[in-house]
């Protein structure tokens, strides 16, 4: 009897470990698919209603990876349950297509635009680039960054430049416009200025500018447009935009890296600090939603071909992207490859810079006809592999 009682008290601890693993898997089985349902819905829900939808959009790549990993794991143990994870991914098939693109067999060479310009005159190349003030505040490498960015622009030989966070000192050693004029950009939009420098968004073009203005209701620091005269006489309206910054300070950046590296450090109030970052993200998303509505409404009334380029500060799985992209073609989804990541600085390290376009409206219907829409198509898209700014440049060759 003594031995039997003693045997009852023995425990190897293995069942407890299995139990904790089971609880973790059970939680993940519920959280991950629900998170992906949330990412599917977040592009339709204005961020002012539920702030968490913005955060779910940012978590989308990690939720997909977690769902795929759990689906494969369950495939070996609980085959029916694995369908939950794959169904959640399938629900987000469109969002997945916005986030990653497979290579094309007929992808043209990056230098093909200039080589074929004589035989294919009905196309233009656009370069959109947040130049981060041309590195003006990089005190140890100010002129070096400016010169490298200007050199990159010259090598790309785009017909249209959409530059965000443009900066040009009135001091003689920092004259950007003169450099760009020598590269063939004889036309540009008006720049904001004070006593010492020019700044803001800017459109530079090899084509004549017929008209330029700001988008009603928005600051020229957020968006402006210009009507360009293409070869042959057609008009192209070009918008460039820079939506509100997330306004992360050095403390936020340090906390973010600490959260990644020391998630269990009790010396920091993570809940309060992480909540501060989440509130900044949600606040910016609400501002972005209103800004894109105004850009969208203005562009929708334009009868000409439309090109919209800029820094959205939002990833593709967001309400702002979905609102602006509806009815437009995204050059990346037409001809891009890979993840298309454009932000190389602090969070969010996703695709947040875009080139959209649409054909001219049919005068009879006020809508884009199928024939006109088919003619305006992206032939080539590329994310520049340079780190001269905290953003990478993006370019597209578009047939019209």
What are these regions (language model features)?
Residues 1-19:
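N-terminal Lys/Arg-rich, disordered targeting/topogenic segments
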Residues 21-36, 41-76, 83-86, 94-95, ...:
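Metal-dependent phosphoester-hydrolase catalytic domains
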Residues 39, 62, 81-82, 89-123, ...:
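Structured beta-strand-rich core segments of catalytic domains in phosphoester-bond hydrolases
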Residues 123, 128-146, 168, 247-284:
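Acidic/histidine-rich helix-loop elements
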Residues 125-131, 145-173, 226, 237-242, ...:
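Active-site beta-strand/loop signature of hydrolases that rely on acidic residues for catalysis
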Residues 129, 183-189, 327-334:
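Short hydrophobic/aromatic-enriched beta-strand-loop microsegments
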Residues 137-143, 215-217, 344-346:
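Short, solvent-exposed loop/turn segments at secondary-structure boundaries
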């Amino acid at each position: 009897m003594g031995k039997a009682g003693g045997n009852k008290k023995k425990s190897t601890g293995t069942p407890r470990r299995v139990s904790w693993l089971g609880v973790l898997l059970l939680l993940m089985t519920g959280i991950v698919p629900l998170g992906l349902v949330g990412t599917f819905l977040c592009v339709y829900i204005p961020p002012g209603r539920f702030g968490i939808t913005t955060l779910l959009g940012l978590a989308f790549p990690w939720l997909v990876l977690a769902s795929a990993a759990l689906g494969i794991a369950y495939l070996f143990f609980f085959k029916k349950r694995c369908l939950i994870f794959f169904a959640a991914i399938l629900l987000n098939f469109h969002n997945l297509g916005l986030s990653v693109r497979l290579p094309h067999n007929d992808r043209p060479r990056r230098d093909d635009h200039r080589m074929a310009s004589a035989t294919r005159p009905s196309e233009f190349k656009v370069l959109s680039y947040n130049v981060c003030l041309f590195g003006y505040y990089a005190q140890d490498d100010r002129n070096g960054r400016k010169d490298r960015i200007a050199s990159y622009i010259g090598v790309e030989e785009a017909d249209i430049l959409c530059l965000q966070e443009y900066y040009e000192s009135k001091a003689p050693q920092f004259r950007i416009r003169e450099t760009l004029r020598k590269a063939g950009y004889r036309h540009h939009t008006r720049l904001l200025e004070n006593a010492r420098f020019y700044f803001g968004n800017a459109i530079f073009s090899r084509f004549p500018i017929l008209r330029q203005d700001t988008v009603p209701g928005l600051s020229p620091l957020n968006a402006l447009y210009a009507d360009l005269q293409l070869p042959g006489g057609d008009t192209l309206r070009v918008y460039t935009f820079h939506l509100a910054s997330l306004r992360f300070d050095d403390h936020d950046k340090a906390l973010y890296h600490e959260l990644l590296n020391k998630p269990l450090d009790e010396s920091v109030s993570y809940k309060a600090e992480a909540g501060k970052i989440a509130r900044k993200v949600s606040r910016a998303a609400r501002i972005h939603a209103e800004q894109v509505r105004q850009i969208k409404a203005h562009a929708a009334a334009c009868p000409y071909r439309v090109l919209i380029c800029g820094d959205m500060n939002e990833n593709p799985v967001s309400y702002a992207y979905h609102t602006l992209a509806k009815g437009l073609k995204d050059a990346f989804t037409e001809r891009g490859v890979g993840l298309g990541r454009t932000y190389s600085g602090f969070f969010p390290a996703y695709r947040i810079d875009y080139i959209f376009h649409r054909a001219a409206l049919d005068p009879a219907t006020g809508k884009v006809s199928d024939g006109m829409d088919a003619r305006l198509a992206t032939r080539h898209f590329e994310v520049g592999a340079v780190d001269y700014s905290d953003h990478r440049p993006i370019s597209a060759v578009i047939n019209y």
